[in-house]
Amino acid sequence: MTIDVYDNVLPEIDSQLIDKIMSDREFYWQYYHRSNSEEEIYHWFRMAGRTKVEIENNGFEWLLPFWDHLMNKYDLEEKYGVEQFRRIYFNAHTYGVEPRPHRDDGDFTMMYYPLLSWRKDWGGGTIIWNEDTSEVEKHVAYTGNRLVVFPAK
């Protein structure tokens, strides 16, 4: 399984803008998202959209230049066969909200860590399990302005 970790993926001014937006108390989160599991999984979630038009209509047009930047900078089409996003959404886990192991749908998962002031002693990050979930394939620590790309299944 190929797990790619890229640091400092956006220019500093852009990463600061995203950090500010995501840290804003006015950013509206929903507390529940079924994901692709039959099991109810509670965590903070916000759907940006499944198409460019939907993303614009939902007020997240600021995401589209960042997507284009990542597509070009990391040649996502050549490296991963990604021609377009399937959907863009936000997940968040706060203290006491524990994530559950799950399999993502689609071909690839791309996760961007936006918070620049994240402290290592808070923990966090992403655990990627092997196929039968018996062993941890990789733990990716949370570092602001980091992109993690791995096969979704």
List the model feature ranges, each with a label.
Residues 1-81:
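Non-heme Fe(II)/2-oxoglutarate
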Residues 57-60, 64, 68-153:
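Catalytic core of non-heme Fe(II) oxygenases with the double-stranded beta-helix
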